[in-house]
């Protein structure tokens, strides 16, 4: 009687963590700690007096001077709450304008054929090569000629549309929306604007969320723009208002940290609202269909 040798089962891969994974996790953790440390100490210093902040070693846990720092902040910046609301208004207006104009421009570049399309797109992309400070003086002169100095239009209009946003929208629309879908809508009698509103906008939600969050943060952190076109302290945005506290005798570091801690809250709210869209937008195209 012959016997049949059964094949020896191969040993599966070990389910343990590979040493290279441990190293990778350690590097990521170290990077996260380095990035979060300034925010941690900002919140800590907001609750301590200047004397405690400048002591060695510096405090590493919360104190009980936040109310004093906030009171000092409001004394030095009597328009602080107006500055905060003003910054929110400008950032939201710039974000809304970018979402509308960049999505329209990206839709046109992705789905329409028109004369000098390639040249115009290359020109728009070429503006990304110019450093931002190159346009500061021309922008200030134009705002002065138009009589927009110290007005919200001086901050909103120049930032209403950007090359990066147009590029993001164009690439996403070209890869996520099939032309056959738009042709079918045209056959059904839908107008071009109706196609944009009813078909394009719902399908580019992840890209809009990413662009909106990036634009809001950039507008919120904008320092040079308000510095050039705003004259009254009441019209200062948050970064400019906090910067004005330096150079006025003894710098109130506790008050600055308290104001910075308050200024971070709108960014956290925006990130919480748009984080899902941000992740979807960043991972779009990473998985091949």
Where are these regions (language model features)?
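Short, Lys/Arg-rich, polar N-terminal cytosolic tail immediately upstream
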Residues: 1-16
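A structural signal for multi-pass alpha-helical bundles of membrane permease subunits
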Residues: 4-6, 20-289
């Amino acid at each position: 009687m012959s016997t049949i040798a059964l094949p020896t089962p191969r040993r599966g891969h070990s389910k343990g963590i590979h040493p290279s994974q441990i190293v990778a996790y350690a590097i990521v953790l170290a990077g996260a700690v380095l990035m979060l440390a300034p925010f941690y100490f900002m919140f800590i210093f907001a609750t301590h007096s200047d004397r405690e902040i400048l002591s060695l070693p510096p405090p590493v846990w919360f104190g009980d001077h936040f109310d004093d720092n906030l009171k000092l902040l409001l004394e030095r910046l009597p328009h602080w709450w107006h500055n905060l609301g003003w910054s929110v208004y400008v950032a939201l207006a710039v974000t809304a304008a970018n979402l509308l104009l960049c999505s329209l421009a990206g839709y046109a570049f992705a789905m329409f054929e028109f004369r000098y399309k390639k040249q115009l797109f290359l020109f728009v992309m070429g503006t990304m090569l110019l450093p931002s400070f190159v346009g500061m003086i021309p922008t200030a002169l134009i705002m002065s000629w138009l009589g927009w100095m110290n007005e919200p239009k001086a901050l909103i209009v120049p930032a209403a549309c950007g090359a990066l946003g147009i590029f993001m929208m164009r690439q996403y629309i070209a890869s996520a929306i099939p032309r056959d879908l738009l042709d079918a809508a045209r056959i059904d009698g839908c107008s071009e604007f109706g196609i944009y509103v009813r078909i394009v906008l719902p399908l580019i939600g992840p890209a809009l969320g990413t662009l909106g969050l990036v634009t809001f943060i950039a507008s919120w952190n904008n320092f040079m723009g308000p510095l050039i076109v705003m004259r009254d302290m009441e019209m200062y945005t948050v970064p400019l208002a906090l910067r004005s506290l330096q150079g006025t005798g003894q710098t109130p570091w506790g008050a600055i940290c308290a104001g910075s801690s308050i200024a971070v809250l709108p960014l956290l709210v925006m990130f919480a609202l748009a984080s899902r869209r941000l992740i979807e937008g960043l991972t779009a195209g990473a998985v091949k269909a």
